[in-house]
Amino acid sequence: MSCRGMVCVHGVSKRFGRTQAVERAELCVERGEFVALLGPSGCGKTTLLRLIAGFEEPDEGELCVAETRVNGVAPERRRVGMVFQDYALFPHLTVAENVGFGVRRGDRAERVRELLALVGLEGYGGRYPHELSGGQQQRVALARALAPAPAVVLLDEPWSNIDPLLRASMRDELAGILRSLGATVLLVTHDREEAFSLADRIAVMRDGRIVQAASPEELYAAPADRWTAGFVGAGNFLRGRIDGELVETLLGRFPVVGRNGASEVDVLIRPELLELRPDPQGSAEVVGREFRGHDVFYRVRLADGTEVVSQRPSTELVPSGSRVVVAPHREPVRVFS
């Protein structure tokens, strides 16, 4: 195996008893890249992070950090910094002592001052974790992870315990700090919005496997399979029949991309591609709606009883019970067997 990235995972598997937590995982993270491991609970993403950190050892496969094979290497010698979900600060140590833990004594005081300034906590060095807010504790955890100048920063759902009203701002602030340092980051999350807003690439995991690793734009527009298509964003799946370069559906004919050879397929149409035009003679009916501020998600029943979802700006409110014409954008669509 060639260890050319800052993190390389090659054929890594991990089993706990009869449970296959990670199965033949393949991933390479380049220097300065921000990659998110995205998946539902129990998919193996945290186990994979712990394997990279050295808290677990793989049953098979190879792991590299900073172009060095780290199988069997102790966590403290892997050149990784980790921010845990619960931050794992030492309650009996001050902020400064937490940040300086593991830093050589001769460099400690200056390094602590530098990092507390970086995370906006100058003057907090003498406080204890219980005297800080959740957001401040998170900054301390990040400073501690950065203190030994790691090659890679690992984040295990670090914003899950933050108040939802503060989560986005804290997320953007800490991600901004990491980007300003040119850090290589691997984030574990089950939050699609978080992954899409922060990551350069997203590795989607399911049942212990990485099913697709791609940029957010590619992942949304060209998902590898039907499950991934539905997991990374809302989607309507209509039955369709391939006819040459087109596919015939209840909503008309569409150009096809990514054909798979089948004649009967499921056709992915994202909600934002379905316009609604109020029309008393329309063949479809709005049967429900969900207001989400900037957008409204409409549940629409077609003439044959099939229901689809349309995402429209909240400036175009359509009352429930309205008859409408569903007007899809005639963009190329993805199809799945």
Feature roles, as predicted:
Residues C8, C28, C64, V325-A327:
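ABC ATPase nucleotide-binding domain
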Residues F34, R78-G81, Q85, L89-W227:
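ABC ATPase nucleotide-binding domains
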Residues L38-P40:
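The feature captures the beta-strand-to-loop junction immediately N-terminal to the Walker
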Residues A53:
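Helix-to-loop junction immediately C-terminal to a conserved catalytic motif
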Residues D59-E62, D207:
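Conserved coupling/switch loops of ABC nucleotide-binding domains, chiefly the family-specific signature
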Residues G61-R69:
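Conserved ABC transporter NBD signature motif
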Residues A224-V287, R299-L317:
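ATPase nucleotide-binding modules
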